[in-house]
A protein has these predicted regions:
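Conserved functional micro-motifs across diverse proteins
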Residues: 1-173
Length: 173
């Protein structure tokens, strides 16, 4: 069974040797070019998606509108995505030992931001890679420093894993 990553984790792509992706930098932040009028009353946050090539060959990468899905709160409601303030990876060649990072600005009700799920559907050399998901939340540290951060990561990761196992068991029962 596929389990989501915790925000901050790297995810390898087996079919593309050396290529890996990471969702990180999830924190409250106002957008650089001002708030969108449609996000009135919502709390803004940002996140980063970094693609790294540790392999011997070049990969053409696309990470654009519609390839990122951000869900918030216990019911997984869609976050408001501020495309105007976000920066994507559009047709970029990642050579060996290089990285490219997309920055996404989103917003939602502040109470729902304790749980944020980010799904990434990367396009590599004109082919769609498998979707990958990361789970995190505002207020949780991702760098793993200190015992409190380790407990927060393990707690969220365990909650997500246990929930998904329970759903899978219900489906097979």
């Amino acid at each position: 069974m596929y389990e989501p990553n915790v925000v901050g984790d790297w995810q390898e792509y087996d079919e593309h040797a050396g290529l890996r992706v990471r969702v990180h930098g999830l924190h409250a932040q106002e957008p650089p070019r001002g708030r969108d009028a449609a996000a009135e009353g919502l709390a803004y946050f940002s996140l980063r998606v970094t693609v790294e090539n540790r392999g011997p060959e070049r990969f053409g990468i696309h990470l654009e509108d519609g390839q990122l899905d951000v869900r918030i709160g216990p019911d997984g409601e869609s976050a408001f995505l501020d495309w105007r303030n976000s920066q994507f990876i559009e047709g970029y060649d990642i050579y060996p030992l290089r990285r490219a990072t997309a920055v996404l600005f989103a917003a939602g009700p502040e109470a729902a931001l304790a749980r944020v799920d980010i799904q990434v559907h990367l396009r590599i050399d004109e082919e769609w890679a498998d979707r990958r998901m990361w789970s995190g939340g505002l207020g949780l540290q991702e760098d793993g420093t200190g015992p409190a951060a380790a407990t927060a990561h393990e707690g969220l990761a365990c909650q997500v894993s246990n929930f998904l196992r329970g759903q899978a068991e219900e489906g097979t029962a």
